[in-house]
A protein has these predicted regions:
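Nucleotide phosphate-binding/pyrophosphate-handling subdomain across enzymes
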Residues: 44, 135, 140-145, 152-163, ...
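Internal gly/pro-rich beta-alpha loop/helix module
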Residues: 160-161, 174-189, 193-258, 264, ...
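Hydrophobic anchor at the beta1->P-loop junction of P-loop NTPases
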Residues: 46-48
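Charged, amphipathic alpha-helical linker segments immediately N-terminal to NTP-binding catalytic cores
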Residues: 1-21
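Beta-strand->loop->alpha-helix junctions that form or flank phosphate-binding loops
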Residues: 75, 197-200, 212-229, 250-253, ...
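ATP-dependent carboxylate-amine ligase catalytic core
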Residues: 7, 21-23, 27, 31-41, ...
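C-terminal helical cap/extension that packs against the catalytic core
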Residues: 197, 201-206, 210-215, 219, ...
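Hydrophobic positions on the alpha1 helix immediately C-terminal to the Walker A/P-loop
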Residues: 56-60
């Protein structure tokens, strides 16, 4: 008989070995284990789906709710360094020790009465974190969808307010080949009679149609809420509430106002259960933090960290980099999964980069540095790129970053 793990690290290894596939779309298995655990939330649940902007939206929701004095729980994925980053309670990352009892509870429910249910790594870990949050006496639970929406493990919980951020082409093998089919999957988090905030200014018709079909309370960008602004401040207007003279969100990037607008619409839609003051909105937006989203690290050379991983988010990254002004040389450390649409990503940011540092990543899904370099060469040649651009190969991200920093001048 297999020994039960006693540490978070042990449980994560256990989860990796349980299911034959990393991604297995379907809610039946997750819903069955959730039913066995009697998993439910007493507080309002806000679920966020979208191709890009999910993490930023969750961080803004959390920041404003904390400033309003609410006890918050947030589930996001993936993590950057440590698994525990996926769950925050009252603004703080939970401890590994706090997670272990909930992994034990999921396993007990999974194998209950010898009727074993197979769960993927994501499904198992999601259920463990949801159970922790459901036991935490929260005022609001904020859930970030992992992939799609309709069949995602987070959708085992009925949301009180759905937010759908930008929709673009990504994960086509699971979600469909175009924005309409991808939008339809993401709209699956909506619930009848409950607010559904769609902050994509060009939302696919499939999202609007689904909201109408099920009778969700659809809040559309441009119709039910909007924003305006100048270089100093911005304004927001919803169905019955307005905010004027807001400071720009502390998260950098032109796209963050769209995300912030959806967040404020959600708070207006939930105002009877989660009222927030104008001061909480101002303070929360000014103080929100999120690693890896156009994150500028203090010091020289200027170091920007960004987790852009599809053409849409790379386009936003490129626009944000371009807006930073002139730097003598731009160095790019780049690693990516093999299933990503790499050519348009490289083509978009390519004109801004002078030196590339392609890196392997410690996961089987990753594209090798050598293949990344080949794909960049092909894109570079087609575009008739500059001959003074160089590239190099590295075995891991730290080595690549160290090489880039060593080669850079302070003004780069």
């Amino acid at each position: 008989m297999q020994t039960k793990p006693h540490t978070l690290e042990g449980w994560l290894r256990h989860c990796e070995q349980l299911h034959p596939r990393n991604i297995d779309m379907g809610l039946d298995r997750v819903a069955e284990v959730a039913r066995r655990m009697a998993l439910r939330f007493e507080c309002p649940v806000i679920t966020v789906a979208g191709t890009n902007g999910k993490g930023s939206s969750c961080a803004m929701l959390e920041a404003v709710a904390l400033q309003a004095g609410y006890r918050t729980g947030v589930y996001t994925s993936p993590h950057l360094v440590h698994f525990e980053e996926r769950c925050r309670g009252h603004g703080e990352i939970v401890s590994a020790a706090d997670l272990v009892p909930h992994f034990e509870a999921v396993e007990a429910a999974r194998i209950q009465n010898g009727n074993e249910v197979s769960l993927t790594y994501f499904e198992f870990t999601t259920l463990a974190i949801l159970r922790l949050m459901s036991h935490a006496l929260l005022d609001v639970a904020i859930l970030e969808v992992g992939l799609g929406g309709r069949l995602d493990a987070t959708n085992a919980i009925d949301t009180d307010c759905a937010i759908i951020t930008s929709i673009d082409i990504d994960h086509t093998e699971f979600l469909g080949p175009d924005r309409e089919s991808i939008g339809r999957e993401k709209a699956g988090i909506m619930r009848t009679g409950r607010p559904a905030i769609v902050s994509d200014p060009m939302a696919p018709q499939s999202v609007v149609d689904h909201a109408r079909e099920i009778g969700a309370d659809l809040w559309s960008f441009g119709r039910d809420f909007n924003f305006s602004g100048d270089k100093q401040q911005w304004n927001w207007a919803g169905r019955g509430r307005r905010y004027a003279g807001l400071a720009y969100p502390s998260l950098r990037g032109a796209n963050q106002l769209v995300n912030a607008s959806g967040v404020l619409a959600a708070f207006e839609a939930l105002r009877e259960r989660l009222p927030v003051t104008a001061q909480a909105v101002r303070n929360g937006m000014a103080m929100v933090e999120l690693p890896g989203r156009f994150q500028i690290v203090p010091g020289q050379p200027t170091l920007v960290l960004d987790v852009a991983h599809n053409p849409h988010s790379v386009a936003a990254l490129t626009a944000n980099l371009d807006a930073m002004g002139f730097f003598p040389t731009t160095h790019a450390v780049f690693g990516a999964m093999a299933d990503k649409d790499l050519a348009p990503m490289l083509a978009k940011v390519g004109p801004l980069v002078d030196r590339w540092y392609f890196t392997d990543l410690p996961t089987p899904r990753a594209e090798s540095a050598a293949v990344l370099q080949q794909k960049w060469n092909a894109v570079h040649m087609v575009a008739g790129g500059r001959r003074d651009v160089t590239s190099s190969l590295h075995s891991d991200p730290l080595q690549a970053l160290q090489a880039a920093v060593a080669a850079a001048d302070p003004a780069d």
